[in-house]
Amino acid sequence: MSKIEILAPVGSEEMLRAAVFSGADAVYLGFSGFNARTGAGNFDADSLKEAVRFCHARGVAVHVALNTTVYGGELAGLADAVRAVAASGADAVICQDLAVAKLIGDIAPQLPRHGSTQMSVHTLQGALELKELGFARVVLARELSLPEVEHITEHCGIETECFVHGALCMCVSGQCYMSAFLGGRSGNRGSCAGPCRLPFEANALPEGKPGRLHHLSLKDNSVIDKLDKLQAIGVASAKIEGRLRTPEYVAAAVSACLAGREGRAYDRDLLKNAFSRSGFTSGYLDGKIDGTMFGVRSEADAELTKKTLPALRELYRRERSRVPVEMKIEIEEGGEKLTVTDGTNKAFAYGDAEPQPARTDPTESLSRSLSKTGGTPFSVEKIDVEMDGGPWFVPGSAINELRREALDALLKKRETLCPWPVNEVELPPLPLRTLPPHRTLRARFERWEQVPEQALSGVEYLILPIAQADRVPREWREKTLLELPRVMFGALEEDTARRIAATQDAGFAGYEVSNIAHLRLCRGLPMTGGFGLNVTNNLAAQYYADLGLSSVLILPEVKDSDISTIAPTRDGKPVPTGVITYGHMPLMVTRACPLQNIHDCAHCDKTGLLTDRKAKKFPVRCGLGVRTIYNPVPIYMGDKPGALTVDYGVAYFTLESREEAAAILDSIRQHAPFEGEFTRGLYFKGTN
């Protein structure tokens, strides 16, 4: 059984040293401009090479995060970033956007790709689809239980990676739009402002009263004491979250993970003092998802961290001897030769000290001197001593100099970069769409009861959750797309597969897919792309079109000028693109329930409100094992039909009654102003 890899976060050069010196097997760090932690100290082409040299010399792998969504105007810079990573010889790239995966496959096809947790992979079919697309590893969603992780790991055929320590986002990674819509800072772009750490109160509050409790803030995850179980089921890598944290935090987490992997006790209090939010939770992996998972960073927590810093720094003050080497020293009358090998590389050192005849066997003292590798990454496993005509005495100072010279030479050899082969790839120019002569309207409803009788009039497609399929009259089905659940925890993926099988010959127009797993579930069937795919550029849109999508809904975070550069084709014909024209945007989809802070499920009607510090009320709806938190203000673009160069708009109904939906559809058809509070979303502002 292979040892599970300890993978540490790096957000600065000091964090890199802390991770390596405390014993991490691998590190992950961000490449400037294209990673999900823009606030961290990220690496450019030159500093990345130095980081790879430092790590590879010590037997530590380097994974580079290029795991943001990318806009069209950034694709040329992204291609340069891929070339830089390939030139560094880093061990893998972590990516979210299929445009990144596509460019790696074209430019540096041998460079391994890891599917970021931002890809929202949480099911077996999602992991299998990544394998089909050429990924070597999948970083699984944090929300999974141990049996769910085991099921995926056992059957997916690629490596799996699990978070074992660090911050827990409230929302399923890759599906959070709260920071973008509330402040223009996109989590999918690495700029999350962390609004879930602000007050959001689930208690019923009077209108105008601000929320003061933190019912969207989860404690930090820590399942280090379950590393043996993760290792036993075949998980390849144990990931520590925290590129925005400190070297001391990294050292504490790595040290604890090393102990946990070996079944030794570790100082849980020291780990907690390094950083916690009122303690830790293991609720997801244990399958115990309840109100005890929530917590905040208190002043007492911060004070404990300050007091613990000196002890934590001791964990990474010294170089760790971690690279096993073998030595052979040959002594003859004219001088000495020392050979050092790590099994792959060899280094030599020659001495000219004139050996003197020894009165006793010097083998033991020679071995002692040669074994003194403190301050280097090397650990001597074996020493051979050969003497021609001896025994010979050589001064200890001469032996020490030989050792230093040979180990320095070996270190330099290990620091040699091994770039990945690259292909010359020229990116096609960005397309520039013009406004189509006729733009269509699609209407998405949460349940059949919302659908007005006149909905088919002037609507290209209805979109309904697949669980509502039996409610749709046969005469409506050829214009109805069945929406698959964005998130399918537990048995929901198998249930969804059964529903697809039961409906594929029932006269429906096709399926709206919003997760990478859906591509596999619907292979060979008519598919359209939903916003959960996070399409932000033409390269990704084209990739999805090549995988079978007949239309693509662009992520509502994309600005108008970037929307106009998304124009995929299929068989030489344009593939329609669309935007959400109306709707309360689902800002979060969560497995933990914020309403559990005030009552249990038995006393819940599956609806609720969260009130923020500005007294805004965010609707919450529970269903299919998750909770969806909606923007209190809807997007409305119905009176701006020519503002966005797309083929269709989607009226995305969630909270509305049938009468409200009918009135809104009429307003969109008539290009009328919206009555009430609304937002243009990010279509004109964009995100940073």
Please provide the spans of the model-predicted regions.
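Active-site pocket-lining/capping segments in soluble small-molecule metabolic enzymes
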Residues: S2-V121, L140, P147-S237, L244-Y543, ...
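Extended, well-folded interaction surfaces typified by the phenylalanyl-tRNA synthetase beta subunit core
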Residues: E132-F135, G157
